[in-house]
């Protein structure tokens, strides 16, 4: 039979394996990198037989995302094999691949600990060095039950009995046999770069009534270099952890016993947040947005009308007042539409751009709450643009310009994707085509590279997703620009056209930074707590050497404060080295040391938090330097408002 392999039509003998077929089509170097293949789209082992009628065979390489997933899944099996060798009484349960790695759950005589990792990794390495093959077999379900009962693997027996299939597939790696759909790597030698990472407890099948299992997490990559880079990123992430830095810098706290998933902002953290909020308000006013604010509670009937009650109520909070049910808002769009409807709108009035730093509440399960990055109460830089269809493209390009300017300001690279119509959607073909074309043309006019996510739009309209990339390569969902045909229809939003008739506008939902809490958390990690001078809660600290400099330091502090610098004075009777170190740990941009020599010269010794010493400078020079470096961006100019 003739089969397509990477663009070539090749004859494949009946009964040949995928490996045989690929060996004849690929160079030796490429073939050695193949882990599995796709037969007409279905993922199978490289040893699988090519069925008659197959039209396409696609190799799955070790350095592809699918290949990496296979390596990780297979490494979980290798780890389970090693654990069973070292701890024969341990019972195995499940071991999938996950983002950035894999895990396996065991019912062991004692919980595993990181102290066990070295021995387990040594045993895993033996399996890898032996290039132990992965061998697939199939057997009737009853025989599989008997097999695992004979091995004392009661959890596997429970899983098999719950399966609807009459036949199940098994994989053998050495003496270890596991229930698994597969596919797997050809042999353990492909899992040459792995690391066990951590242990945790996990209830069997996630039910706290079931036994507590011991879960071992690990990671694996196609080569040692990539693994080393990944481990370095993990260490960097620990060093930059916003939860640790938030406590160290006294920015915020959580009190889970009284308000889980809700932030208590301390003065310094609230100052950072306020600076960002003030900046956002001024930028939006410059770009001709109207600043509005809606209520926290809206009658349940409104959420039913919008569709949120049917589709989103599990994430909402409800309360009752005077026998009426109210929903605490999880988003701001309904209030903005009611503001739009409060007056008759002409085509000349459009677009209307409503901006709100809106506090919203969304119920997140306690297990997914994570510092500032996943909370239950947060503030969105939310806006809704209600415009004529012919204005849509220009409005979107202006939003993209704002995204670009803010990402550049905070030092982030970013990726853009346009998500198109899903299978289940509402609205006419014409409306979808208009909106999708407007999004694509706007991105192209901006000169920004983008990808298309086919079918990933919302059911009510296409969208642009922006993911920012931080300094250690992580991606974070940030801006969303979304076209909506549904809510203007449901809430009967209209404008009077040039023809005197009523017309339906288009609504654009957009958030640039998204959740301010999450964005500040990402910022803390991006800067490792060392905010740029304009954003630092304390921009300069004056340090005395002895009490003799106190009077001069107070006059210097007053001069800097008058110039708008956020400055503190440390006149404690402590050693200078201690005070300098403390200021550095607090990430204060400018450390200004004053001793007798500086008082005599009428200046200060300027040090940066990095340890660099700028030397003695007059007070006027210091004021000028800090005024320039600490000036807020919206006072400097230079922000652009469109694409040429």
UniProtKB/Swiss-Prot annotation:
Keyword Phosphoprotein among record annotations: no
Region: Catalytic, residue numbers: 241-532
SUPFAM superfamilies: Class II aaRS ABD-related, Class II aaRS and biotin synthetases, ThrRS/AlaRS common domain
Matches recorded under InterPro entries: aa-tRNA-synt_IIb (IPR002314), aa-tRNA-synth_II (IPR006195), aa-tRNA-synth_II/BPL/LPL (IPR045864), Anticodon-bd (IPR004154), Anticodon-bd_dom_sf (IPR036621), TGS (IPR004095), Thr-tRNA-ligase_IIa (IPR002320), Thr/Ala-tRNA-synth_IIc_edit (IPR018163)
Catalysed conversion reaction: tRNA(Thr) + L-threonine + ATP = L-threonyl-tRNA(Thr) + AMP + diphosphate + H(+)
Required cofactor(s): Zn(2+)
Protein's name in the database: Threonine--tRNA ligase
Organism, as annotated: Nitratidesulfovibrio vulgaris (strain ATCC 29579 / DSM 644 / CCUG 34227 / NCIMB 8303 / VKM B-1760 / Hildenborough)
């Amino acid at each position: 039979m003739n089969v397509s392999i990477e663009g070539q039509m090749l004859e494949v003998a009946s009964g040949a394996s995928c490996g045989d077929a690929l060996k004849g089509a690929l160079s030796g170097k490429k073939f050695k990198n193949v882990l599995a293949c796709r037969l007409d789209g279905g993922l199978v082992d490289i040893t699988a037989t090519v069925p008659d009628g197959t039209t396409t065979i696609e190799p799955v390489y070790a350095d592809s995302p699918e290949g990496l997933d296979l390596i990780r899944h297979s490494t979980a099996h290798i780890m389970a094999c090693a654990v069973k060798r070292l701890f024969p009484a341990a019972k195995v349960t499940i071991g999938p691949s996950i983002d950035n790695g894999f895990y396996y759950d065991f019912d062991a005589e004692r919980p595993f600990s990181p102290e066990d990792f070295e021995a387990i990794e040594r045993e895993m390495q033996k399996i890898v060095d032996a290039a132990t093959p992965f061998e697939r077999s199939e057997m009737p379900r009853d025989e599989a039950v008997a097999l695992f009962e004979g091995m004392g693997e009661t959890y596997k027996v429970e899983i098999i009995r719950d399966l609807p299939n009459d036949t199940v597939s098994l994989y053998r790696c050495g003496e270890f046999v596991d229930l698994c759909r597969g596919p797997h790597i050809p042999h353990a030698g492909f899992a040459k770069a792995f690391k066990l990472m951590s242990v945790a407890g996990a209830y069997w099948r996630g039910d706290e009534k079931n036994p507590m299992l011991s879960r071992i997490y690990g990671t694996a990559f196609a080569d040692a270099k990539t693994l080393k880079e990944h481990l370095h990123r993990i260490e960097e992430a620990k060093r930059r952890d916003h939860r640790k830095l938030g406590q160290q810098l006294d920015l915020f706290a959580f009190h889970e016993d009284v308000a889980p998933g809700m932030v208590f902002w301390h003065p310094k953290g609230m100052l950072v947040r306020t600076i960002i909020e003030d900046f956002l308000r001024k930028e939006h006013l410059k770009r001709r947005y109207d600043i509005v604010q809606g209520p926290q509670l809206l009658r349940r009937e409104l959420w039913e009308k919008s569709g949120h009650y049917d589709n989103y109520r599990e994430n909402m909070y409800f309360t009752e007042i005077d026998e009426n049910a109210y929903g605490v808002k999880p988003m701001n769009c309904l209030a903005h539409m009611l503001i739009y409807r409060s007056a008759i709108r002409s085509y000349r009035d459009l677009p209307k751009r409503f901006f709100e730093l809106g506090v919203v509440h969304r119920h997140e399960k306690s297990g997914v709450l994570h510092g500032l990055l996943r909370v239950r109460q947060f503030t969105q830089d939310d806006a809704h643009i209600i415009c004529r269809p012919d204005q849509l493209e220009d409005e979107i390009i202006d939003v993209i310009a704002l995204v670009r300017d803010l990402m550049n300001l905070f030092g982030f690279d970013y990726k853009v994707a346009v998500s198109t119509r899903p299978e289940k959607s509402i609205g006419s073909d014409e409306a979808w085509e208009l909106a999708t074309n407007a999004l694509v043309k706007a991105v192209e006019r901006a000169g920004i590279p983008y990808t298309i996510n086919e079918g990933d739009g919302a059911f009510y309209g296409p969208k642009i997703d922006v993911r920012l990339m931080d300094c250690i390569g992580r991606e974070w969902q940030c801006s969303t620009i979304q076209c909506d045909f549904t809510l203007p229809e449901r809430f009967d939003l209209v404008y009077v056209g040039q023809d005197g008739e009523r017309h339906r506008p288009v609504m654009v939902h957009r958030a640039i930074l998204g959740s301010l809490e999450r964005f500040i958390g990402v910022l803390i990690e991006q800067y490792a707590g060392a905010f740029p001078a304009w954003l630092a809660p304390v921009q300069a600290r004056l340090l005395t050497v002895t009490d003799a400099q106190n009077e001069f330091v107070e006059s210097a502090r007053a001069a800097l404060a008058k110039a708008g610098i956020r400055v503190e004075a440390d006149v404690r009777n402590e050693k200078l080295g201690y005070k300098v170190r403390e200021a550095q740990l607090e990430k204060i941009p400018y450390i200004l040391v004053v001793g007798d020599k500086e008082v005599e010269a009428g200046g200060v010794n300027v040090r940066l938090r990095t340890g660099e010493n700028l030397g003695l400078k007059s007070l006027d020079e210091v004021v000028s330097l800090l005024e320039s470096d600490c000036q807020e961006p919206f006072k400097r100019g230079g922000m652009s408002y469109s694409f040429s």
